A protein has these predicted regions:
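Short, surface-exposed beta-strand segments enriched in small/polar/acidic residues
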Residues: 1-7
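Active-site-proximal helix/loop segments of hydrolytic enzymes
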Residues: 7-227
Length: 227
């Protein structure tokens, strides 16, 4: 699966892998975090398997990199997505909100209190939207963003991830000028720096949240014993 392809022959699969490798290097060297790639070679990985790889490694974040395409040759700019559950009715969610197993690699499973595998992301929608917002802000400072910019959609690659997850369309390969940009190492570096900083900002926001919650708990008066 080569994904989308530009007029000059640039292929989505090649650019996304290049950016992913550079992002891994940046995160590991600057933040000291471990990055797990869903693929590190020219091979096809099914959408469900991508989420399973993240779940199997108990990842804290899931970032899915893509390149957009359009029938309009003038469409341009990056778009950031987080999961939308608008296509799932409240009845479906309530019926399936119970203990289920989440598939992992090698045919193994792990029991967790969430909805069905297809709706695993439901418990992380708010944090996914928070991360997507940070990605949008940081990319906007560095590259051209599409008018749609920050969006929510029920992407299959996101719904199975049992952690905050975002999908980033780095630009439109159907636009000849943007195809040239996407192949540029300078452009790729701006994308990497934007994603790196968004991870830093997201991590800091979680630290602030934990400190606030911890402070609130410590300031609560002790519960009185019943006579």
């Amino acid at each position: 699966d080569t994904g989308t392809q530009g007029q000059a022959g640039l292929q989505e699969k090649d650019i996304t892998l290049q950016v992913a490798r550079r992002l891994r290097e940046a995160i590991e060297s600057r933040l000291g975090l471990r990055v797990v790639m869903t693929r590190d070679s020219d091979r096809t990985v099914r959408l469900d398997e991508r989420a399973a790889i993240a779940n199997n490694n108990k990842a804290d974040l899931f970032i899915s990199l893509h390149i957009n395409s359009s029938v309009s040759e003038t469409a341009s700019g990056a778009v950031v997505y987080s999961l939308s559950l608008n296509d799932y009715g409240e009845e479906t969610l309530s019926e399936n909100r119970q203990s289920h197993t989440v598939p992992l690699l090698g045919g193994r499973t792990r029991n967790i209190e969430i909805v069905l595998w297809d709706l695993a992301q439901v418990t992380h929608v708010q944090d996914s939207a928070l991360l997507a917002g940070f990605v949008d802000v940081e990319l906007r400072r560095r590259i051209n963003m599409n008018a749609l910019t920050l969006q929510q959609a029920p992407f299959r690659v996101l719904v199975g991830a049992n952690m905050p997850a975002v999908l980033v369309e780095m630009g439109f390969i159907s636009n000849a000028r943007q195809e040239e940009q996407l192949a540029s190492l300078a452009f790729q570096d701006r994308v990497v720096q934007g994603l790196l900083q968004s991870v830093v900002t997201y991590r800091e926001s979680l630290r602030d949240r934990w400190q606030t919650e911890s402070s609130q708990r410590s300031n609560q008066p002790p519960a009185e014993e019943e006579p």
